[in-house]
Amino acid sequence: MGKTTFTYGRRRRDLGLVGCLALLLFSEQPVASQSRPLVRQWDEALGYYNPAALAPLGTGQIAGLWGREDHRHSYYLLLTYLPLELLGGRHVVGAQLLHHQQDLWEHSTFSLRGSACLPLSEGKRLQLGMEGTLHRLTFDGKKALEEGITNSELPTTKSEGKALGLSLGLQFYGERLSAGIAVTDLFGVHTRIGERYTTQLPPRYSATLSYHIGSAVAWAFVPAIWGSYSQDERWRSEVRGTLWYHARIALGSSYRPGEALGLHTRLRLGELSLGYQV
C-alpha cells in the first residue's frame, strides 16, 4: 500500500499548495456511523490534528489531501492558512473542509481556526490554537434497505443531522525541537439522525514531537513521533525518522505498532516537493 504527496509553497507571505494521496482502511459496518479519517501524512497537514500547528509565521498555505480504499470508502480534505497581524502580534487564521464517505454514511465538516503566537525567546515561540467545527452527517436509508440492511432505529430515507464541535491545541516551535498537544471536539459530538438514532463522536487527544539533528545545508536527520487516543479508536501511534540531504532529498521509514512498517521519500525542486510513502 503506497502513498504519494506533492507540495508547492512559497516562503513569507505567498500562498502554497500541498497535496497528498493516501490509501486508508475504514470500517465496513454502517452502524460505525461517525468517525474521523486517519490521515497518515500528519507531517504534511499537522493542522488537521492540532489547530495551533498552522503554517509558519509569515507564510500562507493551501493544502489538499485525498484518500480512498474503494468507491465506498474515501475522503478529501482542504485546508488553508493565512498570516494575520493583530494587536501588535503576528498570528495565523485558517479554515478546513472535510468530506468523509463511509459506506452508507457521509460525514462533512467545516472548520474555522485561529492560532495566536507568543514569542518566548529568539528562535522559540508558543502557539495557542482554537477551532470551531460544524458537523453534518448523512445516512442513506433507502440504499440500506436495497442492500438488505435493517435497523429499527435508523431512518429508511436519506436523512441528515448537524452538530457543533470545539477543538483546542498548543504547539511549541524551537530552533530544533517541535512539540504539540491537542484535543479535537473537546465536548464530543452528538448527532441525531431521524427520530430515533443518535450517534456520538468522542473527543480525540493527540500529541506530536520532532527534533532536527544536523544542518539544512548538509545532512540532517529528523526523528518524529505521533500519537492519539479516543474511546472509539483507542491508542494509535507512529514513529518515523527522515534523513535529509541539503534539505532537498529525503529518505525515511515509519512504524505503526501492531500495524505496518513503511518507507517514504521526498524530493524538493525549488518550491515544489514530491513525495511517496509505502
Q: Where are the model-predicted features located?
A:
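Bacterial N-terminal signal peptides
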Residues: 18-26
